[in-house]
Amino acid sequence: MIKDKPNRLMKLFLNVALEPWILRHYSSIKFMNEIAVKPDQSCLMLMNHYSFNDGFLLNRICRLLLKKQLKAMVIESQMKAFPILKYFGCFSVSKKSRSMIDSLNYAAESLKDPTVMLGIYPQGGLYSMHLNKIHFVPGLAYIFKHAKNVPFQVFFGVTLLDYLENYKPVARVYFTSYEGERDSNKMEEAYNLFYQSCKQQNQRLYRPPESVVDAV
């Protein structure tokens, strides 16, 4: 497991230079919902994972919307390819290693800090944003079990892109708060209901015939 090593100067570099430079590839980034964030509780943010840019988008969400300190679980191969990520709050997980338990324990432990937002991509890898469903790989249940006495909020995030009249894509990020049972199967079901709702909202942006909009 590669642990994060937050560095104030590197974090400043991320916020003022690297994040804007990476996210310049979007025409705009729009947060489509407001969420009520409790300052005395940590946050778990679950999002779909479709590109390398997701991490920088997650940092912006954490910084501007949640106003928390970022911790993000990242596939170990990506951490090795981009070792600078550890200075921004990222730590590794390897699905084919015994160190996976160390990563899950570290994630559960981080939720004890109310200043933290823990970002997890439940798909466990990069997948097309055009999938009809988001699958959850094992691991969340372990985190919930080892953080069962810790008060923390759970948020769902869905990022969808459209070009429409723009030269570069517009990223629309939809959010909702999850108040249900801390059960990974029920959470996966709830996430997919929200995911379908977000896709439906995105499809209706330019008022197409209702017959071509996906049914939820």
How would you describe each model-predicted region?
Residues 19-26, 94-99, 131-132:
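Short, flexible loop segments at the rims of nucleotide/cofactor-binding pockets, characterized by
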Residues 12, 17-49:
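Helix-to-loop junction immediately C-terminal to a conserved catalytic motif
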Residues 25-31, 99-106:
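Glycine-rich, highly charged phosphate/nucleotide-binding loops
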